[in-house]
Amino acid sequence: MLCQFSFKNFKSYKETTTFDFQATSIPEFSESLLKSEKADALLPVGVIYGPNGGGKTNLLLALSCLISTVVKPIYELEKAREKIIIQQKISAAPFYFNEISREMPTEFEVYFRQGKNEYRYNLSICGDDIVEESLYWKSIGGKRTGMVFDREGAEITLGASINKASINRSVNPKMPYLSFLAINYDIPVIVEVQKWFESCIVKNYANPIADRQIMFSADESYRKKIVRALNDVDIDVSGYRYDEENHELYTQRMIEGKIYELSFNDESDGTKKMIAALPVILLALQEGRLVIIDELDAKLHPKLLRYVISLFKNKNVNKKGAQLLFTSHDMTTMKNTVFRRDEIWFAAENERHESEIYSLYEIRRENNERVNSTAAYDKQYLEGRYGADPYLTNMLAGGDWQ
């Protein structure tokens, strides 16, 4: 499970930026939190709102860049241990509007849980070269942190969890050492970290191949889950079939004891979008994965979007700690009946054209109090109270809202 992600000098983001899945102490939707006996609770959902060009997509691209940088070499050499749902390699591009930043490295740090341990992985890239890289771990609830490896340029230091005598410390400067170890060795701590990175789903609607592989899995129980989910949102299908010869999907309906088929192309847009989104969402819920989707609301009707969000927040459905991170423009779901205040985030540019993010929980009113959990979030957002400059500086500082 993702706890926290930080990055610096990536596209529209110049300074260190942190997105946090660690739950605050607020009471709303406490039953939906991902809880561990010895660790702080995590959020099952995170949504990012904001104006076009504010940096919503670039935040997701930063996380996707880190994931793909680690996973791509493993995948290309067919050393993956998990079913990888990632479509393309994303390059680390520095901040646009500063000559010094263009020459500086892009930095990433991800803090996550896998198995019984917590890991903190850092990666710094300048051009195509790895400048710095490190991996540290500790047991969940533990206090002692151990180094797995630390890399500065060509110098690599190994921790006690790795048998130093048999490990090659000479690696291509363009390849993450984490990827190198995953490809060439069977080291338990590396395998666990590798599995987390490989489990992350970066949803790309431009390439449906991965969805098709999931949707037409031989696992009949999985196919039934897809049909049940469609039925839950009043899409009355009894099954589906894929014609390999014609490469065409057909939905099936049972009417008076007889099965009728309809070409996917003849379905309504809402049905098409739901069928397109469901495979990776259900896979994430079934296996406890993180799924990252840009503009999820553009793919789904508001009713369907609310349904998808509810799946991740329902502990009876989300039994393995799946998480959903997405961007949205949809105001109908920006409500206290859908999200906690720490699940709602905003991305906007400041006066220096640098993207910044902040959560609804962080915003202070003029009396220095936080936004109330009973507030009409969508209404106040449209009034400009949660928006970009000139409101941003005043709100975070507890200034005047007008």
Please place each PLM-identified region on the residue numbering.
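Conserved ABC ATPase signature
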Residues: P44-P51, Y242-L282, L290-K303
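C-terminal lobe/lid and adjacent interdomain/linker elements of RecA-like ASCE P-loop ATPase modules
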Residues: M1-Q4, R253, S310-Q402
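Extended helical coiled-coil dimerization/tether regions that scaffold
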Residues: K8, N204-D266, K272, Y377, ...
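Phosphate-binding glycine-rich loops of NTP-binding sites
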Residues: A41-S91, M274-I275, V280, L311
